Amino acid sequence: MKVKVVYLGVVRHKVGRKEEEYEVSEGSSLKDLLTKIVEAHIALKDLAGSLNDSQIDPTLIATLNGFAVNLNSSRNVILKDGDTLTLMTVIGGG
């Protein structure tokens, strides 16, 4: 299965690209994909935190096909062929 990943803001800056496509196995979870992304882009490790402990930085937010997803529950989200994951950080200021 192919899943498109779009990077915005700080995440795009750390990754160095706008988007890319990942090949994942049937039945893969969002956690599986996040692990692949961090392995490919070690600069995201600070935001992804410890994926094994589900302690992802709360400033990292994601949408899957345009709907918000809780990254700390990523092992419960099963991906489908053609999904689009968007990763970004919270924008703040004042």
Regions found by a protein language model. Give the residues of each.
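Ubiquitin-like/PB1-type beta-grasp interaction modules and other compact soluble beta-rich domains
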Residues: 1-93
